């Protein structure tokens, strides 16, 4: 259910845009939808992830600028800004506490050598930088409707492919005892 709630604002943005061909109207729907999403997550789980707060702030600021100035470039830059902020966070996180951000998120579930965590983390940095750059390329090169489609399907598809690749990488680099321990835990359930 959480994934559905996370996906709802962009799905509404996409639907409103394709029903109206009006990016300003779609942005006007996106802002309260994102606010409602974060409010629901807080109400339901009593915590909101930093990523959701950053996204909310950028939707309000850049979406607001899109509406106020009647300029779609602001909302089109938002995915790039979000991705580049994430890349920066993944890059500098080891300077604060020694662990990579990916290890902080997944380290309790998976035991990996420090070098593997660093490579995974750098892969995420590269992915976020590339995704931000691809977004700029798409909105600068193609029409608005193509960008809206890319925002939903292209970015989601690229992210799913990257996560699948990460899964393959993790499976190849997990210590054998971790794999067998996880298999035994599954058998116990």
From Swiss-Prot:
It is a multi-pass membrane protein. It holds the Pfam family IspA. Keywords: Cell inner membrane, Cell membrane, Membrane, Transmembrane, Transmembrane helix. The chain crosses the membrane at residues 23-43, 54-74, 82-102, 120-140, 150-170. InterPro entries: YciB. One of its GO terms (cellular component) is plasma membrane. Disulfide bonds: none annotated. It is found in: Cell inner membrane. Its main location: membrane. Plays a role in cell envelope biogenesis, maintenance of cell envelope integrity and membrane homeostasis. Belongs to the YciB family. This is Inner membrane-spanning protein YciB. The lineage of its organism: Bacteria, Pseudomonadati, Pseudomonadota, Gammaproteobacteria, Oceanospirillales. The gene is yciB.
């Amino acid at each position: 259910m959480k994934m559905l709630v996370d996906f709802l604002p962009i799905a509404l943005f996409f639907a409103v845009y394709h029903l109206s061909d009006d990016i300003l109207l779609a942005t006007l729907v996106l802002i309260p939808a994102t606010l409602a999403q974060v409010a629901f997550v807080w109400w339901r789980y009593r915590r909101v992830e930093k990523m959701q707060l950053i996204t909310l702030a950028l939707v309000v600021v850049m979406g607001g600028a899109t509406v106020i100035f009647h300029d779609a470039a602001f909302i089109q830059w938002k995915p790039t800004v979000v991705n580049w902020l994430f890349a920066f966070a993944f890059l500098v996180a080891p300077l604060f506490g020694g662990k990579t951000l990916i290890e902080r998120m997944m380290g309790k579930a998976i035991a990996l050598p420090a070098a593997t965590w660093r490579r995974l983390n750098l892969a995420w940095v590269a992915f976020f930088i590339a995704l931000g750059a691809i977004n700029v390329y798409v909105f600068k090169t193609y029409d608005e409707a193509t960008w809206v489609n890319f925002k939903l399907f292209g970015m989601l598809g690229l992210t799913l492919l990257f996560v699948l690749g990460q899964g393959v990488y993790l499976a190849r680099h997990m210590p054998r005892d971790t794999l067998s321990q996880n298999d035994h835990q599954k058998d116990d359930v």
